């Protein structure tokens, strides 16, 4: 039986404008075929095909502002900031996996223990022949537990902005589970098409673990949840869906300040390196003459925001040229790097309702440190 790899680069202004369907099959070495679908502009490289053997990789690359423009805008503002997505290149994604193993980072341990207890209940909630979509995916034990608990899952769709990390994690899941794996290379914060799979799909479920929802401010978190709700309400192409879709999302609960801050200021400095890596990327990829040694990292609880805010603090006044401007970094000012919002269960239910989602079920650990919510569209 021949292997089929789907590789598509779809460029669009909006999904409704995509009117052209291009199908092109190209015979490659070792009996492997490539199918280019839903493409205005298609690009192939031999080295890409080698690592994708046996997987279907779907690439959705919407027209976006140049990254340099985004960085420039963040650094000329009254409060300097950088896009949080800059953390997640291949090295950044690997560093985040290391963070999840740290002693101080309680979130992963507590969530994993909770998932061991509730995975069967989640599997029952999403039902048979469900397509599981995981934005910002990783080859984690949490995902393994859920896939193992799901009755006859139809497919697994990991979505990630880091292409190399996506392929590695997708291959790991494919090795461990007898399920069709359809990796999607995309920015999961932007709406994108859901791939079709070979099996009949009765429903879709989005799995968003690890308190990643907390990395968005309240407005952006609501927008993201609305996007998820739209994705699970859409009918699969075969029209077989008979169950309402679900959004299964984890969030970190509010707790003692010192404990929350320690989770983001680890003694080994992995979280600091996670942030310094962004400075290195700007220097290497955008030729912005920033030096990591001119900054120090610190994460603090900001009560009025209900969030841990991670910042790089300027150690010495210095200036750099960027996009025709000279940007000055004053000693003592900070670059806002990332935020990690915490919620009480009631606060999160209110956020879900504002996103047109209803809370169907909520699970927490015994101490109430971490929660997993099962949501469904309010209209379902």
Label each region the model flagged:
Residues 31-85:
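N-terminal auxiliary segments of SAM/dcSAM-dependent transferases
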Residues 83-84, 96-121:
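Class I SAM-dependent methyltransferase Rossmann-like catalytic core
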Residues 139-151:
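Conserved SAM-binding loop of SAM-dependent methyltransferases across substrates and taxa
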Residues 154-190:
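Class I SAM-dependent methyltransferase SAM/SAH-binding core
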Residues 216-227:
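A short, conserved alpha-helix within the catalytic core of class I
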Residues 235-252:
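Conserved beta-strand signature within the Rossmann-like core of class I S-adenosyl-L-methionine
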Residues 261-341, 353-354:
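Substrate-binding/catalytic lobe of Class I Rossmann-like enzymes that use SAM or dcSAM, i.e.
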Residues 321-380:
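C-terminal lobe and adjacent flexible extensions of AdoMet/dcAdoMet transferase-like proteins
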């Amino acid at each position: 039986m021949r292997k089929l790899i789907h590789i598509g680069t779809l460029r669009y202004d909006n999904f409704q404008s995509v009117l052209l369907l291009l199908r092109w099959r190209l015979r490659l070495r070792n009996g492997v075929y490539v199918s280019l679908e839903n493409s205005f502009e298609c690009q192939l490289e031999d080295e890409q095909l080698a690592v994708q053997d046996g997987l279907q990789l779907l690439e959705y690359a919407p027209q976006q502002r140049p990254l340099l423009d985004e960085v420039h805008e963040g650094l000329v503002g009254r409060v300097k900031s950088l896009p949080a997505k800059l953390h997640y290149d291949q090295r950044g994604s690997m560093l985040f996996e290391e963070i999840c193993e740290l002693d101080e980072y309680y979130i992963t341990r507590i969530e994993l223990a909770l998932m061991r207890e509730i995975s069967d209940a989640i599997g029952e909630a999403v039902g048979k022949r469900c397509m599981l979509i995981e934005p910002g995916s990783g080859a984690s034990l949490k995902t393994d537990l859920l896939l193992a608990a799901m009755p006859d899952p139809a497919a697994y769709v990991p979505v990630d902005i880091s292409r190399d990390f996506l392929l590695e994690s997708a291959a790991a899941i494919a090795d461990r589970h007898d399920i069709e794996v359809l990796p999607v290379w995309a920015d999961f914060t932007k709406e994108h098409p859901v791939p079709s799979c070979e099996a009949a799909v009765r429903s879709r479920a989005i799995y968003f673990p690890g308190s990643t929802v907390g990395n968005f401010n309240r407005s952006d978190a609501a927008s993201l949840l609305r996007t998820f709700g739209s994705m699970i309400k859409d009918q699969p192409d075969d029209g077989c869906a008979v169950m309402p879709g679900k959004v299964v999302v984890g969030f970190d609960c509010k707790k003692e300040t010192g404990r929350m801050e320690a989770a983001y200021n680890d003694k080994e400095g992995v979280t600091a390196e996670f942030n310094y890596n962004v400075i290195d990327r700007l220097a290497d990829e955008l030729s912005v003459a920033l030096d990591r040694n001119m900054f120090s990292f610190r994460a603090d609880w900001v009560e009025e925001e209900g969030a841990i805010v991670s910042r790089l603090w300027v150690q010495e006044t210095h200036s750099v040229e960027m996009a025709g401007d000279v940007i000055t970094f004053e000693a003592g000012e900070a670059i806002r790097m990332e935020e990690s919002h915490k919620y009480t269960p009631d606060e999160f239910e209110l956020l879900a309702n504002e996103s047109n989602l209803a809370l169907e079920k909520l699970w927490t650990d015994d101490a109430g440190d971490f929660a997993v919510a099962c949501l469904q569209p309010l209209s379902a």
